[in-house]
Amino acid sequence: MVSMVEVVTYANKSFGLFEQLVHNDFDVPVKVLGWGRPWKGYSDKSKGLLEYINESKSDDDLIIFVDGFDTKINKDPKDIKAIFDSYGCKVLFSRDPESFSRAVTRAIFPTCSDAVANAGMYAGYAKYLKIILKDELSRTCQDDQVNFNDMICNTYDFIKIDKEQKLFENIATTNHEKKSDAIFVSYPATLGIKRALRSIIEYLQYLYVYILIFIFLMFPFPVTASVLAILFGLVYILLADKSCAS
């Protein structure tokens, strides 16, 4: 059976680079999942993709999954399958650009090599995507990127990261004008107010200890530091996602 290659995204509305993605220069059809649904968390993407694969894809079909708001098709994707197969894996994740700080990125995401996987763009054969998506959804942690990096380090040997950036490249925030040779390029996230607040709520669980240390180092007066620490603690307790906190 000849496998199909399909580009898929998850987007509940038009935002950021969405229109450029679906109306791309190469007339590549993009399957949009999740349209009109309320956003509940990163695992929405895994749920939507798994449902779609189970309903309509064969095990040998190659799925290219990209972020709906930040991704551009940069080159003619006619050689997608050949490029993917050249990596010798069943699932390939894009490499995280570690934009803000290598130390911060690695405080959040499990890593066992010189690269961190980014869940915004990845590709794989349907048979193997079903395996990792089911695993991702079975975990308590609601951050798909944390879960996928843990799988790469501790669970599956059929996953690789696109370190050569031939198929995918995530452009760092500090290098926004970089010219890429990858087929799919993701640019620094377009941040609306809701998306920015959501990011704070989702990632506070990884950084709260470091923030508390920073407060006490920056404010040497015990009363000031204590008040700020209490206020920050209340924000963390009341608002922050703690599903991935160890």
Enumerate the language-model features and the residues they cover:
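N-terminal anchoring/stem segment of glycosyltransferases
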Residues: 1-62, 214-243
